[in-house]
């Protein structure tokens, strides 16, 4: 069985040293230990924090360049933009339909997001 790694960065701004040290560099080093590596630009995730399409598009370019400048070899790794793969949204819809709210309540990312916005406690989950 092939060993695979998957990671991505949300495209919400200009890449910085924290992105490089905390995500890009470790992911590229770790990829050497795997048969296949998948790196993606999480532009759908960015919509949660920024509704300006132009800013997100610029961030996608900046972060893609940061990955490539840091040594990502697009001939050896799969490198893609989240919005270019429609099956991601389809799978997300299916998972949303079968995932219990209790599981989300235990998620650190979900708890942090809801703590920041008490006026919309579940971030639009129940609409």
Residue ranges of model-derived segments:
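NTP-dependent nucleotidyl-transfer catalytic core
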Residues: 1-127
């Amino acid at each position: 069985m092939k060993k695979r790694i998957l990671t991505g960065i949300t495209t919400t701004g200009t890449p910085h040293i924290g992105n490089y040290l905390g995500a890009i560099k470790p992911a590229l080093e770790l990829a050497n230990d795997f048969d296949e590596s998948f790196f993606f630009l999480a532009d759908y995730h960015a919509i949660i924090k920024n509704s300006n399409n132009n800013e997100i598009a610029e961030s996608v370019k900046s972060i893609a360049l940061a990955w490539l400048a840091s040594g990502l070899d697009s001939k050896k790794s799969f490198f893609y933009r989240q919005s270019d793969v429609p099956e991601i949204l389809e799978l997300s819809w299916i998972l949303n339909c079968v995932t219990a709210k209790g599981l989300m309540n235990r998620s650190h990312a979900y708890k942090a997001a809801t703590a920041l916005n008490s006026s919309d406690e579940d971030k639009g989950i129940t609409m």
